[in-house]
Each structure stands twice: as C-alpha cells, then as structure tokens.
Amino acid sequence: MKHRLFTLLFLQLVSLALFAGTVTTYPAPSGAPLNDDFTVRVRATGGLWQTVDTYAWNVDHTNNGRHTIEKSSVAYFDFTDKVEVEVTWNKGDVKTARVRPLSKNIATTLHGNTVCFSLDRPLDLSVEVNGDTYHNLQLYANAATPVYKNAGQVAKALGMKKKDVLFYGPGYYDLGNDSIRVGSNQVLYVAGGAYIKGFASVWQASHAKVIGHGIVNPERQHEGIMVRYSTDVMVDGPITTQIPVGGSERVSVRNAKVISWYGWGDGMNVFASNDVSYNHVFCRTSDDCSTIYCTRKDYHGGCHNISVTDAVYWADVAHPIMIGLHGDIERNEVIEQVVYDDIDILQQREKQIDYQGCIAINNGDNITVRNMTFRNIRIDDIDEGMLFNFRVCYNRKYCHAPGGGIHDITLENISYNGSHANLSLLTGYNEQRTLSGIHFKNLRINGQRIHDKMPGKPGWYKTSDFARIFIGEHAENVTFE
C-alpha cells in the first residue's frame, strides 16, 4: 500500500513538473539606463520568485503646447502557462492601483505598496499607481521563444548561413554614429538582455528579419528600426522608439513595442506600402501611434491591404490612428483595404482641434480613402480629443490640394467609456469630394448602444446627436445600427 501511494505521489510530482509553466528573465546589462521607481518580481505558479530589471524610458508630457520629458519604467520577461507578478512602488504610499488595458480584466490585490496579479497569456500592460500615467511601468509579458546563444544557433534554427546572422547577445552596445544595416536574406537577432544604443535599418532588402526581445534605443530623436524600400520583411519582438515602413511590400510586424518622447515621434508609420500587417503591438508615442500615408518622405504611391490586429495605442500627443493627409496630387492615390481589429486606445491628449480624433481620417492631396473596417476597438477616457475625425479637407499646412473622398467605412463594436471626449466630426469637402457610406454598428458610449431605432430617441433628433457626432456638409449615407 505504501509503495502504491509513493508511486502515485511520484507520478503526480512528475506530472506537475512536466506541465508547470516557465519564466525567463533577462538581467539588464551594465551601461543601460535603469529606473528604481518599481521593483518587479515574477514566478511561475508555485515556483521561485525572480527579479525583473526595470529600464528608464522617457515619455512626453504636454501642457498647452509645451513638452516636458518624464521618466517612466519599462520591464519585460517571457513565460509559458501562467505567471504571478508583484510590482512594488518604491517612491511612496500606494493608495490606488490599476493595470491597463482595462479590457483585459486583470484582477489586482494590493499588499502595502505591492500590486499583485496573475497572467495566463502574453500581454502588454501599463501598471499605474495613484493615477500617475507618466511615471508608470510598461510591463511586457512575452510568450516564450527560443533563446539563442550565438549566431550559429540562429542560423541552424532558421535554415540560413551563419554569415547572414547579425547577432547581438545579452550586453550593452553603443553604436556611436554608426547604425546596423540589415540586407537581403539577413537576420538581426537582438537577444533578451541586449541593449543597443543606436538604430537599425532594413534598407533595399528582401527576405530580411529583425527578431528577439531585446532593446534598440537611439536615446535621441530617431527611428529605432526602419523598413525602407524592402520586400518580405519580418520584425518580431523588439522594444524600440519607432518602426516606420516606407516604400515596401509584404512586411510583418509583430510582438513589437515602441515608446517615443520627442517631436515627430510617430510610432508605426506606413508610407506608400502594400501588404503590411501588425499583430500584438504596443505604441506609446509623442505623435501619432499608427498612420497610413501615401507619397511622403521620398516614398511614392498609395497603400492597400494594411491590417492591424491586437494593438495597444497610447497617444501622449496627436492621434492613436491617423489615415490620409499626405500624397502626390498628380497621382490621385488611393488608400484601401484597411482593417483595424481588437485595439485598445488608452489615451489621446491633443489640444489642437485639427489633430484630434482617436480614429482619424483627414483626407488631403487628392487621395481617395475607401473600403476600411474598424472593429472591436475599446477607448478609455481620454484627456483631450475626439472619438472620430473623418474629414475630406484641405490642410494648407501639410497638403497641396483637398482630399478626393472618403467612402465605405465600417465601424463595428466601438466602445468609449468616459466624459472628456469632444464633439466628433464627419464632413465632406464639396459635391465632388464627398464623405459617404460611413456605417456604425454597435457603437456604445458609456454602455449605451447608439442606433437609429434606439428607445427614447425623439423622431426629430439625429442618431448622431446621442454620440456627439457632428455630420456636416457633403456627408452622405451615415448609418447607425
């Protein structure tokens, strides 16, 4: 009997060991800028606690056009299955704490100055104490991926030549005035625990990759990772400042995080590119988080087949989503076949009315914007801005002609919870340059569904009045279902 019980206990322990989760942390290298505002610890369920180093990362705090740099924190780790997290605030008493996006429903408990919670899936989170969003912790809980110790292991795993692997293992690298150029059939591997002070560029390349969970930070006003005039490119895993894609085709960006703090700090631009996809990305930016533009910065042409899935957008300035505006007035360019799905918008803080809009299509330079879907988008209470800014317009500061038109835009399952959003705008330009076919489906404002047959709506009211949306001239076929 004792032998049987021992056997059963042994098998149970083996089973627990086989199916227990794992946690991988990466010590910060000497020379990397750190922040001691928080102490972060993680462990697999029932495992040993591990400390996660926290980096200092600048963010932009605007007030009436003035910009102040604040120092926030960034930490990251990899895991499988489930993980327990402890975040301790070291700078004072914690009265309140929250973990965003709120839609992820992360239940927290507070023990003194320590916020405790559990995760069962990869998430990009903001841990905020006492309502402070400028000295918060950006916490990136990554899905575990293979950890390579040298270029040979990368080459073997990816079926390529060792000479085509640009390997940056754990450590601190100061590129000075130099940069990393990734060419055709090459892979830049930035390991967890690597910190590159500088930037990288995929330039005139095909079949190139930038992978790994490390950091690429110019520590100045500059794009961290650029994809330019290239085809068949993948960016997977890094933390950086900006990832613009220009004049390129078939580009995949996934599990990437960007934070900027300087002027023109757009997060993930698309310029004159086709077949570009983003999946599981995080953008906290000092300008637009996500943009789609036509001709701009020596990139020429329209854009089609752009998709964004599972993103967190936090615009300390300008727009979370901005489409249109820039093009070549002689080409009559088109932006089409665009999908944004499963998006959390945590902030917009923009004083200028022209540049407000959590979802903005400001169409200029004879561009036609058409056939777009915005689906499953959740907007937190913003500081200052509007929900929707769809205008065929002539912005003389940036454009050389009005836009050509905005047509066939579907917005499905969009929700906003808050009280600070300004009046939204939907307008055309003239009888030839119209806004048409704008279809809202299950739009919810503070839980109330806004639709044409909503109960209690007086017959002489416009449905848009209940969403605080102004529908102006040359706007046709705007519906609410």
For the regions a protein language model found, what residue spans apply to each?
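Extracellular beta-rich repeat passengers
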Residues: 349-481
